[in-house]
Amino acid sequence: MVRITKVHTGIGDRGTTVHLNGETVSKGDDRLEVVGCIDELNCLIGIVRMELKRMPETTLDGGPRTTVLAAQREFDKTLSHLQQEMFDLGAECSTTPDSIPDGMQVLSAESCERLVNEMDEWLEEVEPLSSFILPSGNPIV
């Protein structure tokens, strides 16, 4: 578990930041942009998890909403795991392959393959799409 003791550097903003490997780079650095995109994705996954937990678990007559319960049960664990992997990937992108610290979690080919397999399994349960769907109607989409 990472322990963060402060959230500022104390030296002000000079348009640069320091990667995990100690390298000072411009805040316009491509790797930093990638880390920011990964962080935003991680935040969105967190919002999906929150919205899943906020969905009513019972119908108006008090019966269970089995689809919601199943989604909460199955997806929260998967999304939690994915969030941790995205956090690890962001850290990995904050350094170079030759300067990855000992013991640092890196995203493995097996992790990527597992995610692809999970997505394929989820797609087996839905009807094929005939067009793109615009996200709307519910905060979770």
PLM regions with names:
Residues 1-141:
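Phosphate/pyrophosphate-binding loop motifs in nucleotide- or prenyl diphosphate-using proteins
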